[in-house]
């Protein structure tokens, strides 16, 4: 194996600790070409689509990308912000917020982000952190619930990059934080803040809160993936924090792709049923998404909203994701700090010397 060319190691005093936030990814632009390039990388991941590679590539290249690229580009264009993709914009704000919080607490760590698909990639960012002097790196996936198709593939990509390094940094990983008290508190704070600004649903009159998590094929649950259990755990803890019952609050799964059975109940049909049953108001919150993106803004805020209203519902609210809220940055800082314990994250005091 040929290893990457590296510059000589630096003086030990420059060796630093780094935190790398990792999210799924986003196209570089809301254009068919950029979206096809992004989807080709995303849907070629064997942890995302567990179908024999040769058969799947034929289906992907001939039947999916030529059509889905253009359709998805229109959806991305509908949510694109002046600064760029919502996921990238909010992720960069999370990096800024976490970096500032750690600096206030005298941490000298580097903080940056990478995307599993698209740019900036995980291998490129690991190399960039090494060049900046990082000898220890904490991989912090922005997926609170562990799944093979999200958390594991991010770690795969990082470890593959390490295989090509002659001088590897020390690595720690955050596997999941689905039940972390700070994360649950940040979720509850986000919901309460929205209700304070827009009014609380009248649960006594039948209004509902729906907690929508990203779906995965049901087959992964049967094969031992803990994602479903951890989503249920997060949902139950959030309901408890909000003092809601399972009648007032539902847990659903969105973003189904293909014809196979995915985790149920599905989000869109659930909202359609609620609207048809006479539910006046439905609020939807996505606890598994730490930053707003296509799946929350367009799928929930537009498509699912229309399903509910067309079925007879009167008032639909999409509660924004955690994004860079003060409560989430504080929670993120707490989770990161706990996982940095034992590493030299604070500057050593400069020895005081006296003249002769």
From Swiss-Prot:
It catalyses: heme b + 2 H(+) = protoporphyrin IX + Fe(2+). The keyword Metal-binding applies. It is found in: Cytoplasm. The keyword Metal-binding applies. GO terms for molecular function: ferrochelatase activity; metal ion binding. Disulfide bonds: none annotated. InterPro entries: Ferrochelatase, Ferrochelatase_AS, Ferrochelatase_C, Ferrochelatase_N. Keywords: Cytoplasm, Heme biosynthesis, Iron, Lyase, Metal-binding, Porphyrin biosynthesis. Fe cation binds at residues 214, 295. Its EC number is 4.98.1.1. One of its GO terms (cellular component) is cytoplasm. Pathway: Porphyrin-containing compound metabolism; protoheme biosynthesis; protoheme from protoporphyrin-IX: step 1/1. Pfam families: Ferrochelatase. It comes from the Bacteria. GO terms for biological process: heme biosynthetic process. Catalyzes the ferrous insertion into protoporphyrin IX. Belongs to the ferrochelatase family. NCBIfam families: hemH (TIGR00109). This is Ferrochelatase. It comes from Paraburkholderia xenovorans (strain LB400). The lineage of its organism: Bacteria, Pseudomonadati, Pseudomonadota, Betaproteobacteria, Burkholderiales. The gene is hemH.
């Amino acid at each position: 194996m040929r290893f990457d060319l590296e510059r000589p190691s630096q003086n030990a005093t420059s060796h630093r600790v780094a935190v790398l936030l990792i999210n799924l990814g986003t196209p570089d632009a809301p254009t068919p070409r950029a979206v096809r390039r992004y989807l080709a990388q995303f849907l070629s991941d064997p942890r995302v689509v567990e179908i024999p590679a040769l058969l799947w590539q034929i289906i992907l290249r001939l039947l999916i990308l030529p059509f889905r690229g253009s359709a998805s580009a229109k959806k991305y264009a509908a949510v694109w912000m002046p600064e760029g993709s919502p996921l990238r914009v909010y992720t960069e704000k999370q990096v800024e917020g976490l970096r500032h919080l750690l600096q206030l607490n005298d941490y000298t760590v580097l903080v940056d982000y990478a995307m599993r698909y698209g740019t900036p990639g995980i291998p490129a960012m690991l190399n960039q952190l090494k060049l900046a002097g990082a000898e220890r790196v904490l991989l912090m996936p922005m997926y609170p619930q562990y799944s093979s198709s999200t958390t594991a593939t991010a770690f795969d990509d990082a470890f593959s990059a390490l295989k090509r390094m002659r001088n590897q940094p020390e690595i720690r990983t955050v596997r999941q934080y689905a039940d972390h008290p700070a994360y649950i508190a940040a979720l509850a704070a986000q919901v309460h803040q929205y209700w304070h600004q827009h009014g609380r649903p009248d649960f006594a009159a039948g209004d509902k809160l729906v907690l929508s998590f990203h779906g995965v094929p049901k087959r992964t649950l049967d094969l031992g993936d803990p994602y479903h259990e951890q989503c249920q755990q997060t949902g139950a803890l959030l309901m408890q924090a909000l003092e809601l019952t399972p009648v007032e609050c539902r847990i659903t799964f969105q973003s189904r792709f293909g014809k196979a059975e995915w985790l149920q109940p599905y989000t869109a049909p659930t909202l359609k049923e609620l609207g048809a049953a006479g539910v006046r108001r439905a609020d939807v919150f996505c606890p598994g998404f730490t930053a707003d993106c296509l799946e929350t803004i367009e799928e929930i805020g537009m498509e699912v909203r229309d399903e509910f209203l067309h079925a007879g519902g009167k008032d639909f609210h999409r509660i924004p994701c955690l994004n860079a809220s003060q409560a989430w940055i504080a929670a993120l800082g707490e989770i990161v700090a706990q996982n940095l314990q034992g590493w030299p994250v604070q500057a050593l005091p400069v020895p005081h010397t006296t003249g002769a």
